[in-house]
Amino acid sequence: MDLAFPHVCLWTLLAFVLTWTVFYVNNRRKKVAKLPDAATEVRRDGDADVIIVGAGVGGSALAYALAKDGRRVHVIERDMREPVRMMGEFMQPGGRLLLSKLGLEDCLEGIDEQIATGLAVYKDGQKALVSFPEDNDFPYEPTGRAFYNGRFVQRLRQKASSLPTVQLEEGTVKSLIEEKGVIKGVTYKNSAGEETTAFAPLTVVCDGCYSNLRRSVNDNNAEVISYQVGYVSKNCQLEDPEKLKLIMSKPSFTMLYQISSTDVRCVMEIFPGNIPSISNGEMAVYLKNTMAPQVPPELRKIFLKGIDEGAQIKAMPTKRMEATLSEKQGVIVLGDAFNMRHPAIASGMMVVLSDILILRRLLQPLRNLSDANKVSEVIKSFYVIRKPMSATVNTLGNAFSQVLIASTDEAKEAMRQGCFDYLSSGGFRTSGMMALLGGMNPRPLSLIFHLCGITLSSIGQLLSPFPSPLGIWHSLRLFGAEGVSQMLSPAYAAAYRKSYMTATAL
């Protein structure tokens, strides 16, 4: 009797503990199921899979690509009218290849687009005709296209909105909706002026070089390095219209190219602090008196035609901005809102199309995008894989623009002449440089090889007809400016290959 009572108490206590444990665990599981982690998006009926802010080249192309993969895409664009821009008017051969991989090659048709087979380069009375190479390794027609940017953008918008899972809406995005470091959607004002919200597991900021949302995602700032001043000369056609005319003028380059069967774009670079006023007519006088005399005689009439006929002259800032990865989840930045380089080689659209192809392929294995952690891993991979294309184009664009700047410095002017000589020399040097400029061979090592070649050609200018102390000094300065240790040392070369060449380019 005395032993029975303690046994009963022990068994009763054990039963109570087991019952309480089971009850607690079950309740805990229910709470976890009801209260998901902040990184997991709670889907609402009718929500899109992806919100894209901006329906320019990048936003429209991305919307089409993701919708073809079965994603529901909500695109919010500030102004659905046809854009009027003087940038984004040339698609390199490499860009056309990427456009075709996205199934959008027909958007460059039926807009009075002009075939471009290469460049006509002018310097101090010299002229060189250089073409994009017929390269068996490049699986597409080796020609570019010049066009009105607005016509191209409208075709892309039409193509994207033709898919049933794309909602293309006019509205102004005011801010991103953020919870615990995860972007959940956007607040925007629709075309009726009503402020509303939209939610999606992934938000893509693709609102261009004047992005208002970029600072909400990262602290990247764009640097204004110069201004592109341009206008259109109408009802005229260039001699040999399939060649873009690149003039090594002062203070920097001038370009003329056919953007329709009847219209020619004239554009030149001017640096801050020396920009005449457009509104009071000073710019028109500057173009006629200072720039026109530097334009070759066979092009000068067309250059002056637009000015004499009162064409609208525009000035647009040239910006440079390195790409940085945001620490916030549920969001990615693309296009000029993400990364900008000098437009001298007209490759901005090519870079964003490459980025879209990479991002699309990385997202394809994810059945849904609700897990912000998984999407963040995709974005990190995207940032690495894009390097072969973006690093090559960014470096080339910025380096080429520096070479085109006129200077009284003997070393810099030798580099300018060396670039002209290298481009016009023919053979593998010309074909290699044109393949790089055309996005047909976006390999960093090839870029290093040809930049070294231009540098050596420039040094030859300085040391000709025989070495002098001053020439040798300028040569050493030139090598130092180009970073000889980074280019030639085995350690730097190995690090470069590891960083850029191990990733698979699309």
From Swiss-Prot:
Signal peptide: none annotated. One of its GO terms (biological process) is sterol biosynthetic process. This is Squalene monooxygenase 1,1. It is an enzyme of class 1 (oxidoreductase). The chain crosses the membrane at residues 3-23, 47-67, 447-467. Keywords: FAD, Flavoprotein, Membrane, Oxidoreductase, Transmembrane, Transmembrane helix. Pfam families: DAO (PF01266), SE (PF08491). Belongs to the squalene monooxygenase family. Its main location: membrane. It catalyses: squalene + reduced [NADPH--hemoprotein reductase] + O2 = (S)-2,3-epoxysqualene + oxidized [NADPH--hemoprotein reductase] + H2O + H(+). FAD binds at residues 57-58, 77-78, 85, 90, 157, 173, 336, 349. GO terms for cellular component: membrane. Coiled coil: none annotated. GO terms for molecular function: flavin adenine dinucleotide binding; squalene monooxygenase activity. Pathway: Terpene metabolism; lanosterol biosynthesis; lanosterol from farnesyl diphosphate: step 2/3. It is a multi-pass membrane protein. Its cofactor is FAD.
